[in-house]
Amino acid sequence: MKILILGGKGMAGHMITSYFKQKQDYNVFYTSKDINDKDGIYLDVTDSIKLEKIIDSIKPDVTINCIGILNENANNNPKLAFQINSLLPHQLVKLIERTNGKLIHISTDCVFLGTKGNYTENDIPDGTSIYARSKQLGEIVSDKHLTIRTSIIGPELKENGIGLFLWFISQQGTVKGYEKVYWNGVTTLELAKAIDMMIRNKVSGLYHLCSEKKISKNNLLRLIQSIFDKKDVEIVPNSEIFLDRSLTNTRTDFIYKVPPYDEMLIELKEWLDMQ
């Protein structure tokens, strides 16, 4: 089976690429913005003609879209955010369907405002930021394709990455541990494993990939600190901010059992130690 991963050097994309390359039944291709990457296919995703040529040439059975303009970058560049977060997934569907391919699109819990938590697939996205609105518009809900809503933590190749894991690992001294900011996402390794299972089980539509139990960012940081032996940081509990974008999965046709947080983080550490 031919797999094309768009954004193969990003936080989600590089882990998914590494994981799928270790599976013998997948022939893996990935795109990158790094012109010196000899293994990847160079792509500026705003170049629609090049994108079309790549898809027409490879004819992937499954295309995994890991490209996104995130958070502040989206708010500072609204035109680019809507082009990539909103329009690109719909453009991909049209290109991929020419050869009966399938799109797996990665969305985010940030489509929700975070005022109540436990959001289901049937809840109407109410996020108001440029990032939230652009991601809402890009979600593909179709019986042919799959949109995975989730929130991820994991290593990054870019030193200027903005994810929680990289941020925390690079800190020294004291950091705030938010006791009322709740999360129930997955590691990037767990996301890769879940996508593998979803491909094999032909899952489509909208899927919330989440843990059954939510965890505060304070406790999450403490878990990371313990498992990754991060001794040069003191986590100071802080209850000033309330935010709960936790997801709930109501699908019964396919159930992916997300492991406990400590198990996911231990497995991630073991994976990284082997690389």
Could you describe each region identified by the protein language model?
Residues 3-23:
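N-terminal Rossmann NAD(P)H-binding glycine-rich loop of SDR-like oxidoreductase domains
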Residues 216-222, 235-275:
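Conserved C-terminal active-site "lid" loop/helix of NAD(P)H-dependent oxidoreductases
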Residues 194-244:
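Mid/C-terminal beta-alpha module of Rossmann-like enzyme folds, strongest
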Residues 61, 76-104:
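NAD(P)-cofactor binding segment of oxidoreductase domains
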Residues 33-49:
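Rossmann-fold cofactor-recognition segment
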Residues 45-84:
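NAD(P)H-binding glycine-rich loop region in Rossmannoid oxidoreductase-like domains
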Residues 128, 140-185, 189-190, 196:
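NAD(P)-dependent short-chain dehydrogenase/reductase
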Residues 83, 87-91, 110-148, 152-157:
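Catalytic helix-loop patch of NAD(P)-dependent Rossmann-fold dehydrogenases
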